[in-house]
Design a protein with these regions (language model features):
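Extracellular glycan-modifying ectodomains
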Residues: 2-223
């Protein structure tokens, strides 16, 4: 069965931008353009988006990118990085996104949720980036990210069905592009080795954008 719903879980904007690039991002969902990690997603799901939509948690960001930014005291200091839900229009945008997301969870069509980590280049999540700084091996970092994917899946399965969870683990500054795929039940782990680093939205070298997009089409659009 063809995948009908493509959903970005973050951890930055890169997955949403990639879905736009391959023309399968038809609608907006809550986590498209923000800072997240699996712990945030788990809490938002378990909390039914209550804190997510609670304006009392909103405040100034730590690193102001534009006027349309907003921090969240529970989740991340730069949580809303391209929207400002303290403004009515952006708040209504997130209301629509949340409603659409909840409706999608109830749909019977196949879903692909994507969580991408590029901690070496984006320094996010900070605890994984600290592993880089402390000299942890690539294998140890991958093991850590796989455990995070497993934890996320253990919560997600309580809210929806007929889905795959893709965990993209990106490592930049390699001499050549390569990838590895591992399927563990409905969790797909992609180790993505690129020439350049992620900016959080795209790769610095467009050859890597083409490589990533091509892999996604090859893995998830086979006839």
């Amino acid at each position: 069965m063809a995948i009908q719903h493509f959903i970005s879980f973050g951890s930055l904007c890169h997955p949403a931008r990639m879905l736009q690039r391959i023309h399968v991002k038809k609608v907006s969902y809550p986590f498209d353009w923000m800072f997240t990690d699996e712990k945030i997603i788990i809490d938002v799901l378990n909390d039914d988006f209550n804190k997510f939509m609670d304006k009392s948690y909103y405040g100034e960001v730590a690193h102001k990118f534009s006027e349309r930014t907003c921090g969240h005291s529970q989740y991340h200091e730069d949580f809303f990085f391209h929207k400002n839900p303290r403004n009515e229009d952006d708040y209504l945008y997130y209301q629509r996104c949340v409603s659409r997301f909840k409706g999608m969870l109830r749909e019977s069509g196949e879903k692909l949720f994507i969580m991408m980590y590029s901690p070496g280049s984006t320094k996010h999540p900070t605890d994984v980036y600290k592993m880089f700084e402390d000299g942890s091996s690539k294998e140890d970092i991958i093991s850590n990210l796989k455990l995070r994917g497993e934890n996320l899946n253990n919560t997600l399965k309580n809210f929806t069905h007929n889905y795959k969870l893709l965990i993209v683990m990106n490592f930049g500054n390699n001499e050549k592009q390569s990838f590895e795929m591992e399927h563990v039940g409905n969790i797909h782990y992609m180790t993505l080795n690129t020439l350049s680093e992620s900016t959080g939205v795209t790769f610095k070298d467009n050859m890597d954008n083409l490589f990533f997009s091509g892999l996604m089409c090859e893995q998830y659009f086979k006839n």
